[in-house]
Amino acid sequence: MIIVDNALKAREQQGKPIRVGMVGAGFMGQGLTNQITHSVPGMRMAAVYNRRPERAQHVYRYSGLENVTMAATQAQFDQAVRQGLSTVAEDPFLICRSGEIDVVVDVTGSVEFGAHVILEAFKHGKPVVLMNAEVDATIGPILQVYARKHGVILSACDGDEPGLQMNLVRWVKGLGLIPRVIGNVKGLQDPYRNPTTQQAWAERWGQNAAMVTSFADGSKISFEQSIVANATGFKVRSRGMSRGMKYDGSIMDIHKLYDLDEIRALGGIVDYTVGPAGVKIFCLAEHPDPKQRHYLNLYKMGEGPLYPFWVPYHLVHFEAPNAIARVVLFGDNVAPPLEGPVVEVCAVAKRDLAVGETLDEYGMYTSYGEAVNTEEMNTRRYLPEGLVDGCKLKRAIAKNEVLTYDDVELPSGRLADRLRAEQYRHFSNATWLDEHLQRTQGAANVRSEACA
């Protein structure tokens, strides 16, 4: 990215590379480590934590780094990083607490675990870059409150769809246009996919079958569009957005899928389609100046009133270092929520579910996520897809039925549940989730400031 590349080169010349501490060493963490190691001057992957330490060791060696050392104490950790060793932390909080780390990157995909890591990083003055759309979509707005409280930044990443879309939105606004539709493009949508159906694909690319399932069943794209909605104030037309509407026409004609008056009335929408080919994300925008509309037509953008802008790819870990540099060097947040949540992700039954069943996590066998406007989510007390794991059903649920908090017994003592309750209370003065936690789990979970 222009400006970022020169700033990173300057850090390299000064011998002061950005020291990255990464939590999570899966497929994306592996790619990010390799990218930083070989293609990003002025930055180094100083430390990695993974629940299975051998996986953290692997991502270093995958990247050609052999000077790998384990660190069990803060003193061991800090010394190893100072010495320039490829450091594997036995505890993620060693990364968060170290004065030798400049920024924490969360690549876990976990809401509960991610929340603990993020808040610990904040306590020690560390900015956090998220490659964890799930935590951002579920409790991102309240985590931003804590980031501001501690004077740090919590940012989405470049390369992944939310960051890619917000970069495009900022660019389009810079041209003087008004974004109206921000769209994400998929190649497949089937809410009933599961790790069994996706196993072969996952093995082919060396990915986790549950994560691949979350791509196919619509959960991941719902998390992503929720982040974009919260960063722009845009809504969804209805729960589930366009639910896999297939479009194989030209990107120049995709505006025909949308009624401009309806979209204006909503203040803009986030959406997704299956297709068209050659497009990964798009933004439809209008221009208020008829003189400029004349020029846009001349420049082959069509007659309007909605003009298409798009990016044909998303390169995830190739571009993620740009976000790290933007945050550390410029204090530039990639996709911060404007304020409270605007769109959230509710849990929907993937099959008929029996009373007493325990739900598995997103991307598995029991549920899928759909984007829904916060007013509906709050009023109907839907269960968020990011927090389904470990919930026990109190009644039978039919396939395609939205799950609510009243339908489940929550796992006890989760930080993320307290943060959800605080998020509703802070932004909408709604206390029903506080009351629900008090009724079902006792006073310890009531109105507790999660990071006080």
Task: Pin down the residues of each PLM region.
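N-terminal glycine-/serine-/threonine-rich beta1-alpha1-beta2 phosphate-ribose binding loop
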Residues: 1-120
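C-terminal catalytic/substrate-binding lobe primarily of soluble NAD(P)-dependent oxidoreductases
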Residues: 2-11, 201-446, 451
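Short, ordered loop/turn segments at secondary-structure junctions
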Residues: 51, 93, 109-110, 132-136, ...
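Short gly/pro/ser/thr-enriched loop/turn and capping motifs at secondary-structure boundaries
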Residues: 54-55, 135-140, 144, 161-165, ...
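Short acidic, glycine/serine/threonine-rich loops at helix termini
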Residues: 60-61, 140-143, 166-169, 184, ...
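Structural detector of well-ordered beta-strand residues that form the stable sheet scaffold
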Residues: 89, 129-130, 155, 180, ...
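Rossmann-fold NAD(P)-binding glycine/threonine-rich loop
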Residues: 108-124, 131-152, 157-159
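Rossmann-like NAD(P)H-binding beta-loop-alpha module
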Residues: 147-220
